[in-house]
Amino acid sequence: MGRYDFRPLRVRQTAKALFDSKRNPNLPQWYEVVGNIPPGETLARPILRAPKVRHARKASKLFKPLPITYAEDKLRSDFFGDHPWELARPRLIVEDSGNDAKKYDWSKIVQPGKQLDGESVVQRQMWLMKHRNLSKASAYDAARQEFYAHRHRNEIRARIAKEEAQYVGAYFGKGPLEIGMELEDKSWEAWKRWANVQIEDEQAMRAQMFSGQSDEAPEGEGSDMSAGEYDMAVEELAGQGSIPNTPQSTVVPEGTSAPAHA
């Protein structure tokens, strides 16, 4: 058969040969159709090569879609840039139509059925800029101060409610800050143990690499003698006729006892 398989192109010829040799009593129903509309003769689709245009200009951005921006985008960037920890608070991001903020009355920052968050500050700022004709900075300060006041009030309510519940016997587990501090303490203690091991290994390696005489005497060597040992040394030297640590290296005659150590 070689490199190419031509049997699909010869299906009609094969069917006619089988009919002529009377191996098939009838021609297939598609025989006339394939004869009127024969299959393509090319085995591979040719590669479409576009001519290379020299000195072509840069493609125009006329048909490039413009970025979709909203007026609230810059306000959100300013608020969450100043309050990055607000992004760590859990919040509901599911919306029905994308215009849920338009269903609230933003003449006040607190809305029934909506959690007080950064989006409340953004929408309140937009309302002040539109209806009170305030500047961007003034509206931002006003909305931010209202947000701080209500957030502080909510935290006081939650703290008092917790204290009242604990007073009547309720028990609350550890908070996220306490759990985080415990994990940090464990990591710190593990790091200290690892650091001590590394320091000991480094000191041992340096001691092995040092080939000279160490200035520091080993423990127990070079320390002061006890009183008994000193007396024994004095008596031993007295027998030799000299006593150390005495003025003018006093020479003791034979038969004379050495002075006792004070």
Curated annotation (Swiss-Prot):
Write down the InterPro entries for this protein, in alphabetical order.
Answer: Ribosomal_mS23_fun (IPR016939)
Q: Does the keyword Ribonucleoprotein apply?
A: yes
Pfam name, any one: MRP-S25
The GO cellular component terms are: mitochondrial small ribosomal subunit
| Keywords carried by this UniProt record | Mitochondrion, Ribonucleoprotein, Ribosomal protein
Question: Principal localization?
Answer: mitochondrion
The ranges of region (Disordered) come to 211-262
Listed GO molecular functions? structural constituent of ribosome
> Where can this protein be found?
Mitochondrion
Polar residues compositional bias: what residue ranges? 242-251
Source organism, top-level taxon: Eukaryota
Reply yes or no: does the keyword Ribosomal protein apply. yes
Oligomeric state and partners?
A: Component of the mitochondrial small ribosomal subunit.
* UniProt record similarity statement: Belongs to the mitochondrion-specific ribosomal protein mS23 family.
Name this protein carries in UniProt: Small ribosomal subunit protein mS23
Report the source organism: Phaeosphaeria nodorum (strain SN15 / ATCC MYA-4574 / FGSC 10173)
